[in-house]
Amino acid sequence: MSEKKAVFLTGASGNMGFAGFQELYQRKDQFNLVLLNRGSDKNREKFKFYANDPSVKLVWGDLTNYEDVLACVTGADYILHVGGMVSPAADYFPKRTMKTNIGAIENIIRAIKAQPDPDAVKLVYIGTVAQTGDRNPPIHWGRTGDPIKISVYDHYAISKTIAEAKVAESGLKHWVSLRQTGIL
């Protein structure tokens, strides 16, 4: 079997991130996982089971802190950037939302570029279908190529659109942006 790939996963304490973590963890024979989580009591409790697992490296920190991000990006083959501030909190705290969602991707891009071979790192960025606006009648579905049309006062969508543009304009060799739907 080939060498295990290193995966840096952001947002592992959130709904989508934890589901992604669980899927990757089931394949820990193929991956070494690095998780950057805020050091809250809730998060520490959630991940205490994995604290002594050599295939999981738990980093307690902040996506808006470049040094924390750099420590996690260093050595990563893949970065799955699922973390961020989401609605409804994103709309109550617009300044924090911008700092978190835009600052995090700026730190990730900068950290990738600081690697000895940045072209070897693959980035998966998670955006949102909210970037294309609401889906009121008569349009209930989204399609590839739909224009960016953010709803008024949707700070989450604004921050994710700016962050996605930063990825697209970053000059990174390997990246993709996926726009997730709502999670219930």
Q: For each predicted feature, which ranges?
A:
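Conserved glycine-rich Rossmann-like NAD(P)H-binding loop of the short-chain dehydrogenase/reductase
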Residues: D29-K42
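NAD(P)H-binding glycine-rich loop region in Rossmannoid oxidoreductase-like domains
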Residues: N52, V56, W60-T100
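Glycine-rich NAD(P)-binding loop of the Rossmann-fold in SDR/ketoreductase-type enzymes
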Residues: T64, R96-N107, D154, I158-S159
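Active-site segment of SDR-like NAD(P)-dependent oxidoreductases
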Residues: M85-V86, V129-N136, T181-L184
